[in-house]
């Protein structure tokens, strides 16, 4: 497969059980008291499945549903923060709440209106897609703290006339040409949160160096990729080349979004395609020097959804607060639904199960705690972060 380029609205209670670029390891940023010394965080984000489908029994994705939880922690009450895709991706790196345009997946690559202002908790007051430079992101924080990051986007640049091989996005004001996969290219800009912030894309060299193709497991990159640009497989070979924060987005086939896949590279089952991607890339990550030293891998889903015409799950948790532009983050409800998440780390006992409530803002807040960074947006107000309930192994 080398070529694979607090309380919830449902009322759940919290409990935990157990069974059985250049990376900087010494920096001015320090983790919050009581947290393990994690210095390399990896996120793989998948598409459109609720907890009962993904982690149900029997599951069509046994690697994700059974194998990976046995290696780390299963968070059974982890929630997305909105519908549809783009607002969840954006939230993970900025703490920004959904607004009507990114709830609709930003089919046009447009700015916020110039009249938009900053409201409580750093939220932008209007509706738009590309956030103004006044909105700080996790990548901006990491750079300021002399820590490193990269977004690895599968298929980006496979067809250079569709999107650039690095920092791929439409011209401002134009339609997004990546809304649907085409033969040979399943990159979707709406699943690449970094290109929705002027604080990243306005510095072309900065964005080009940090938002790159995933590449293959052998290190091959799409034709036209700038010389010297490396993908995940190459970066994982040494601690010094592994970013402190890695955000990994599969293409529209292997993230489980499309079924069947237009490129006919996957199964008719989105869950089988998800398992194929994870079986290919997770062992590469968990066997890397950086992960074994001080790593944390999160595998999660953008939102809960169904493919049979039923309304999407729009439940929420963790004191999720609507932003100023959208009263219902989940369009029909207060959130993005229950999706579940798996965490793997040397600092997590194998077989841990947590029923505590978490969401995407919990993820952002935890990463900021680990790296000693201020909280952004709704990471300030979320009621739960990953702590001793999760990090059950002293290492």
Per-region residue spans from a language model:
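N-terminal pro-sequences and low-complexity stem/linker regions of secreted or lumenal proteins
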Residues: 11-12, 20-395
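C-terminal motif of bacterial Sec signal peptides marking the signal peptidase cleavage site
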Residues: 5-7
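Sec-dependent N-terminal signal peptides
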Residues: 1, 15-17
């Amino acid at each position: 497969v080398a070529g694979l380029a607090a309380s919830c609205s449902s009322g759940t209670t919290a409990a935990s059980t157990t069974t059985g670029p250049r990376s900087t390891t010494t920096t001015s940023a320090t983790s919050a008291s009581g947290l393990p010394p994690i210095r390399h965080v990896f996120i793989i984000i998948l598409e459109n499945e609720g907890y009962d489908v993904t982690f149900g029994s029997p599951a069509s994705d046994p690697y994700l549903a059974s194998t990976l939880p046995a290696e780390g922690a299963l968070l059974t009450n982890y929630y997305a923060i909105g519908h549809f895709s783009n607002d969840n991706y954006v939230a993970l790196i900025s703490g920004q709440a959904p607004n009507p345009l990114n709830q609709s997946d930003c089919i046009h690559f447009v700015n916020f209106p110039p009249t938009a202002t900053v409201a409580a908790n750093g939220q932008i007051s209007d509706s738009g897609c590309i956030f103004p430079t006044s909105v700080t992101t996790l990548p901006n924080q990491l750079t300021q703290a002399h820590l490193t990051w990269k977004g690895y986007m599968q298929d980006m640049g496979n067809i250079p006339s569709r999107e650039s091989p690095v920092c791929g996005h439409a011209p401002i004001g134009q339609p997004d040409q990546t809304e649907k996969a085409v033969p040979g290219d399943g990159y979707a800009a709406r699943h690449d949160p970094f290109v929705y912030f002027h604080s990243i894309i306005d510095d072309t060299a900065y964005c080009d160096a940090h938002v790159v193709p995933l590449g293959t497991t052998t290190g091959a990159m799409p034709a036209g990729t700038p010389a010297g640009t490396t993908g995940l497989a190459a970066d994982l070979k040494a601690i010094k080349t592994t970013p402190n924060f890695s955000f990994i987005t599969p293409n529209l086939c292997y993230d489980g979004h499309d079924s069947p896949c237009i490129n006919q590279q996957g199964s008719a089952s989105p869950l089988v395609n998800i398992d194929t991607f994870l079986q290919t890339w997770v062992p590469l990550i968990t066997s890397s020097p950086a992960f074994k030293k001080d790593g944390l891998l999160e595998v999660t889903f953008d939102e809960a959804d169904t493919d049979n015409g039923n309304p999407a799950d729009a439940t929420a948790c963790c004191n999720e607060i609507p932003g100023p532009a959208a009263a219902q983050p989940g369009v029909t409800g207060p959130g993005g639904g229950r999706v579940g998440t798996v965490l793997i780390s040397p600092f997590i006992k194998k077989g841990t199960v947590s029923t505590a409530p978490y969401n995407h803002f919990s993820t952002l807040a935890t990463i900021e705690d680990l790296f000693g960074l201020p909280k952004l947006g709704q990471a300030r107000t979320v009621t739960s972060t990953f702590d001793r309930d999760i990090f059950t192994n002293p290492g």
